A protein has these predicted regions:
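Active-site- or DNA-interface-adjacent structural scaffold in DNA-acting proteins
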Residues: 1-21, 33-35
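Structural motif
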Residues: 19, 153-162
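Active-site beta-loop-alpha junctions of metal-dependent nucleic acid enzymes
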Residues: 43-69
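A short secondary-structure junction signal
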Residues: 2-4, 41-44, 52-55, 89-92, ...
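Short conserved beta-strand segments at catalytic cores or DNA/RNA-binding microdomains
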Residues: 27-39, 48, 55-58
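Helix-centered, glycine/charged polyanion-binding patches within enzymatic domains
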Residues: 48, 67-154
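Charge-patterned, long linear interaction tracts outside catalytic cores
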Residues: 164-176
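Generic alpha-helical structural context detector
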Residues: 57-60, 142, 169-172
Length: 176
């Protein structure tokens, strides 16, 4: 069996967090934020990568130090996410870690569940009041993108871009 061809030096554009689109190279910055719009964890991926594939890595990078001695806190009280994360593996991961979540159900999966009738199971719990707090992540992204270097990404390498986004996140923490 022939091995697929890879660019010399490994990685290629995919390893650098750059993805192809009609407009050229694009990047996604996946992050989690606390209730005060402060970033807790950052992950850089190519622009065409699906959001749900980075759900677990983003949550596993959360580390909030406790005041005084002790291990840092790694588990959030609850997670509010959009429909991109409304799939079985994401919900199962949250259930296994004991994290409450508010994720709306996609209309096509809702229709499939209803089509199955009683075998389709119960709909996932959804709290509209808690879901309204999901805009904190959008506001955190907007705060990060107030920094020109984060908004435009002129950096070619993933680690350089992450090194640009991390101090921007740090300034958000220091200002609030």
């Amino acid at each position: 069996m022939a091995e697929p061809r890879r660019p010399p030096g490994g990685g290629g554009a995919g390893g650098e967090g750059l993805g192809r689109s009609r407009g050229g190279f694009t990047t996604k910055l996946h992050l989690s934020a606390d209730g005060r719009c402060r970033p807790l964890s950052l992950v850089v991926t190519p622009g065409q990568r699906a959001d749900c594939t980075q759900f677990k890595p983003v949550l596993e990078k959360i580390r909030v130090p406790k005041p005084g001695p002790g291990r840092p806190r790694k588990k959030p009280d609850s997670v509010a996410a959009d429909k991109a994360y409304s799939n079985g593996p994401c919900r199962q991961y949250l259930r296994s870690r004991g994290i409450r979540h508010t994720i709306p159900e996609k209309t096509d999966s809702q229709a499939a569940r209803l089509r199955k009738g009683s075998r389709g199971g119960r709909p996932p719990a959804f709290d509209e009041e808690r879901y309204k707090k999901r805009n904190t992540i959008e506001r955190a992204i907007n705060r990060l993108k107030q920094h020109r270097a984060v908004a435009t990404r002129y950096d070619k390498r993933r680690y350089v871009y992450l090194g640009t986004a991390t101090p921007a996140a740090l300034t958000i923490w220091l200002r609030t």
